[in-house]
From Swiss-Prot:
Keyword Transport: no
Source species of the chain: Trichormus variabilis (strain ATCC 29413 / PCC 7937)
GO biological process entries: translation
Protein name: Small ribosomal subunit protein bS21A
Molecular-function annotations in GO: structural constituent of ribosome
Family membership: Belongs to the bacterial ribosomal protein bS21 family.
NCBIfam families referenced in this protein's UniProt entry, alphabetically: S21p (TIGR00030)
Keywords, alphabetical: Ribonucleoprotein, Ribosomal protein
Extent of Basic and acidic residues compositional bias: 49-58
């Protein structure tokens, strides 16, 4: 899990900004969005195959 410790003389806004960067870099938000709804295994395979054809990341 992403963790950010507040440094001395550091504002809350900058700590929140660092936290958001860590969350995005770790891919947590995209994982949450992906798991919002159940995806049938056949549709998951179809989506991954489409992404592979496009040359994107899986």
């Amino acid at each position: 899990m992403a963790e950010v410790r507040l440094g001395e003389n550091e504002s809350i806004d900058s700590a929140i900004r660092r936290f958001k960067k860590k969350i995005q870099k770790a891919g947590i938000l995209s994982e949450v969005k992906r798991r919002e709804r159940y995806e049938k295994p056949s549709l998951r395979r179809k989506r991954k195959a489409e992404a592979a054809r496009k040359g994107g990341r899986n």
